[in-house]
Structure formats: structure tokens, C-alpha cells
A protein has these predicted regions:
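Short active-site alpha-helical segment characteristic of glycosyltransferases
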Residues: 76, 149-153
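Short, acidic, metal-binding catalytic loop of nucleotide-sugar glycosyltransferases
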Residues: 23-35
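Cell-envelope/extracellular polymer assembly enzymes that use nucleotide-activated donors
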Residues: 4-9, 37, 148
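Short aromatic/hydrophobic "clamp" motif used to bind/position activated sugar donors
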Residues: 62
Length: 199
């Protein structure tokens, strides 16, 4: 597919991380690849919020980009478009601690135990997937909303296409919602994944 249209879904919420939304949007405006649409959604809990954005998407590819994350340079969307082969794609990323200091470069990989909390893919903003009867996120999950999606994407499409270029920057710090979840909630959701997919 040449020149695929990319729907960039940006879930946001009234929280501390929302202050980073302008940085996210500016990183999109600086892209050399221009066949995209931006869908900013603020509809409630994480999974429901993203699902609302997915349902509004008109592009060939749905690209998740959380409001506190941003593209790593002007070629990020073009890299996705060039690498795209259908199904799903995950990219490498770096982390920004808040002072635009990049740390912890992460290269995605697959493991069959991802549903048990061994997330070797990365955060939601590394994800792109096809907009053909698209997968939706499982509502009611917070801690494992990403790995549950990755497991179901694998079961539908097989392995993702790996874009090892770190083309996304993950905003890392205490503003992240995942830091606010209790250990009890995390354990409960991991147990749900084991019940659903096995050991």
C-alpha cells in the first residue's frame, strides 16, 4: 500500500499528563508525511476513550499516540507508512523524563508470556494497526490494557511488523496514570489475563 492514510488517535483526560498535549500535537505538525488525520478523544476511562477514537478513524492505519508522548523527529510517520505491510506494527521508543532528556531506548520484541505482564512490546504509543474491522481495547482494564490488546492482535494477525527505529518518545514520570494504580489492582488484572489466556 502506497501513501496510506494514518489516523492518529490521541486519548487524553483531565489529569496532570494533559499539560503535555501541545507537545504531542506539535510533533505531529512537524511531520514530513502529511496523509494523516488527528483524532483527540476525551471520553472517560482509557480503553473506552481509545475505542471512541478508533470508531471515528477513517484512515487505513490507526496509530495510537498518548497525550504525554510524541513523535521522535519529522520522519516518524513516514517510517510507519514505508514499513507498513498490514496487520499491526510496533516501533522502538525512547523515554523522556520531563527535561527532554532521552533515556531507556526500548526495542520491541514478542514473547508468548506477554499476557502475564512481561511486556516486551512497549507502551501504547508504539502501536499501529489496520483499520479493517479493527480490534478494540478491552474496557474495564487499566494496568494490562496494552498487553491484552497485544495478545489479541497476535492471535488475529500473528507477529507484528517490528520497526526498530525509536520513532516515538514516551513521556515518563509521576504524571503517568499507571503509577497511580494499586498493587491489588495490578495483581487482579494479571490474574484475569492468566484466566483468559492460560499460563
Amino acid at each position: 500500500m502506497t501513501n496510506p492514510r494514518i489516523s492518529i488517535v490521541i486519548p487524553t483526560a483531565e489529569c496532570e499528563g494533559k499539560k503535555f498535549l501541545p507537545r504531542c500535537l506539535n510533533s505531529i505538525k512537524s511531520q514530513s508525511y502529511i496523509n494523516y488525520e488527528i483524532i483527540v478523544v476525551e471520553e472517560g476511562k482509557v480503553a473506552y476513550n481509545m475505542n471512541c477514537g478508533i470508531k471515528k478513524a477513517t484512515g487505513d492505519i490507526i496509530k495510537i499516540l498518548c497525550h504525554d508522548d510524541y513523535f521522535n523527529g519529522p520522519l516518524a510517520l513516514e517510517e510507519i507508512a514505508i514499513a507498513w505491510k498490514g496487520g499491526w506494527l510496533v516501533s522502538g521508543c525512547v523515554h523522556d523524563t520531563g527535561a527532554e532528556e532521552f533515556v531507556m531506548t526500548h526495542y520491541p520484541g514478542w514473547n508468548d508470556h506477554i499476557h502475564r505482564g512481561f511486556n516486551t512490546i512497549g507502551g501504547l504509543s508504539v502501536l499501529a494497526f489496520e483499520n479493517k474491522d479493527p480490534l478494540l481495547f478491552t474496557e474495564g482494564l487499566d494496568w494490562v490494557v496494552d498487553i491484552d490488546f497485544y495478545k489479541r492482535a497476535f492471535l488475529r494477525y500473528g507477529l507484528p511488523r517490528f520497526l526498530v527505529t525509536p520513532n516515538v518518545v514516551i513521556g515518563y514520570g509521576p504524571h503517568q496514570t499507571s503509577f497511580k494504580l494499586t498493587e491489588e489492582q495490578r495483581t487482579k488484572e494479571i490474574n484475569l489475563m492468566v484466566e483468559k489466556y492460560g499460563l
